[in-house]
Regions:
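Structural signal for membrane-spanning alpha-helices in multi-pass inner-membrane proteins
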Residues: 23-26, 49-53, 79-86, 110-117
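Interfacial loop at the N-terminal end of multi-pass membrane proteins
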Residues: 2-5, 25-38, 45, 85-89
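Core segments of alpha-helical transmembrane spans in multipass integral membrane proteins
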Residues: 14-22, 33-54, 70-74
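Hydrophobic alpha-helical membrane segments
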Residues: 44-45, 65-83, 104-110
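Membrane-helix boundary connector in multi-pass membrane proteins
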Residues: 58-62, 77-100, 118-121
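Final/C-terminal transmembrane alpha-helix of multipass membrane proteins
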Residues: 98-118
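Membrane-interfacial loop-to-transmembrane alpha-helix junctions, especially the N-terminal start
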Residues: 8-13, 33, 59-71
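Cytosolic juxtamembrane helix and N-cap/initiation of the first transmembrane helix
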Residues: 1-18, 119-121
Length: 121
């Protein structure tokens, strides 16, 4: 049961959905060219995650999931702890613990599932 819950493929798909929909598509101001360019660049992460979910398996999948998700999780921690602000839509958004709990949990569990299936522990 725990192996199924911590299967990197499941978390790769969940992170891709969370990253693509509420993370990029919904908050983007599509009238702004810079925002469109940044959103397009960020959507490339979704392609990478989907390839990793469906094109790899086993320890290789776990290791690459860890290598991708681990730094993203650390990046969220640093941005939140510094209270950084960004503008992706019409209003500036400040990185707070409350607002960023869902992506922090998703990327963190993806990194954990990758670590546990990597064969490194």
């Amino acid at each position: 049961m725990i192996d199924t819950l911590l299967d990197p493929m499941i978390w790769l798909i969940l992170v891709t959905l969370g990253h693509t929909g509420p993370g990029v598509i919904l908050p983007t101001n599509w009238a702004d060219d810079t925002a469109k360019m940044v959103a397009g660049w960020m959507l490339l992460t979704s392609v990478t995650l989907l390839y990793l979910a469906f094109g790899m398996d086993g320890e290789e999948q776990g290791r690459l999931a860890l290598v991708i998700a681990g730094p993203v999780w650390v990046w969220f921690l640093v941005c939140i702890s510094q209270g950084l602000e960004y503008t992706m839509g019409k209003e500036p958004i400040t990185m707070t613990w409350k607002a960023n709990a869902p992506p922090l949990v998703l990327w963190g569990v993806l990194a954990l599932s990758g670590l546990l299936s990597s064969g490194w522990v």
